[in-house]
């Protein structure tokens, strides 16, 4: 299968596009032009590759999780260790690429949105490296949940704006960042943190994150002597770590691809972020994608224990993969993610981010199903330092409830 998405209008099948007001159209067209020029310039990629090596610490290891594999007794599990990047997650791959692009465009200021704070920290880091002014928009709810990352961003010289609109989470931060971009287009570049938004953002983010899958593909061959793994697993909020792992394998049809969505308290409750399980097509933040919405087309609130997954939409390329049945998207509850978080910590000595824990939880199930002859690559998108206090509080609260129930 030859895969050449997006088309010239930024559509992945029927998803994607550019649904933006006239005031933003100039900016996205300027961005696309600058991006095409950078793609054609070998020095751009050479400089970026050097930064990825020397500053970020790439390539990240592909680690055979022997203890986890033996513990489950199923398929071999290989972890793509994006948690070992500088700043602790995959987000730096995109932030660095986009800040370098903005610098080439002659922009002076960087703005970004963040949920868990990882993209905010990565953007503030890249802005500090390139000596650019930086403002990060973050939902007030997430500011509370991720106080440590807020301090990190400020330490790196960024200004953090707490967004008090709506439910004060990621989608509200995106809205605030887009408004700010409209007002300051001439000297400002907006760095979207996931593979969504108006074209060319999903393509740019995918291309910068595809380093994950390209490395993993070669590393798997070098480690095993086999051509391809049987499956890929990655968590999906907006979907940038997943698209980064999946895209280099999209034409390899023998490789099954699984995105794990946040099922929160369960997909049959109102508290989840399982967009492809429960959503339907709609326009959000400049792109046609699957969206959680009510019967009147109003965007529903997304919910997840993990701040990085509670987005009510999903990148248009994931909607397309789902539509053409190239990838499967499976819901994973808070409870299951917490089990994955503890299991990986206990058996491998690796504390995963809550986002990545959704992928670990499903990988455990899938490994049992596939059996010991098969193998999979799981994207460990980030480290769990930022989540340890939240998990501690949650587990203590759960233990207290159980204690009361037995009393």
Curated annotation (Swiss-Prot):
Pathway linked to the protein: Amino-acid biosynthesis; L-tryptophan biosynthesis; L-tryptophan from chorismate: step 5/5
Pfam family, one: PALP
Highest taxon of the lineage: Bacteria
Keywords: Amino-acid biosynthesis, Aromatic amino acid biosynthesis, Lyase, Pyridoxal phosphate, Tryptophan biosynthesis
Cellular compartments per GO CC: cytoplasm
Catalytic activity, EC: 4.2.1.20
Catalytic activity, as annotated: (1S,2R)-1-C-(indol-3-yl)glycerol 3-phosphate + L-serine = D-glyceraldehyde 3-phosphate + L-tryptophan + H2O
Keyword Amino-acid biosynthesis: yes
Cofactor(s) for this UniProt protein: pyridoxal 5'-phosphate
InterPro entries: Trp_synth_b_CS, Trp_synth_beta, Trp_synth_beta/beta-like, TrpB-like_PALP, TrpB-like_PALP_sf
Molecular function GO labels: tryptophan synthase activity
Modified residues (N6-(pyridoxal phosphate)lysine): 91
Alphabetized NCBIfam families for the sequence: trpB
Family statement drawn from the similarity comment of this UniProt entry: Belongs to the TrpB family.
Assembly mode: Tetramer of two alpha and two beta chains.
PANTHER family assigned to the protein according to its UniProt record, in alphabetical order: TRYPTOPHAN SYNTHASE, TRYPTOPHAN SYNTHASE-RELATED
Function comment: The beta subunit is responsible for the synthesis of L-tryptophan from indole and L-serine.
Protein name as annotated: Tryptophan synthase beta chain
Native source organism of the sequence: Streptococcus pneumoniae (strain P1031)
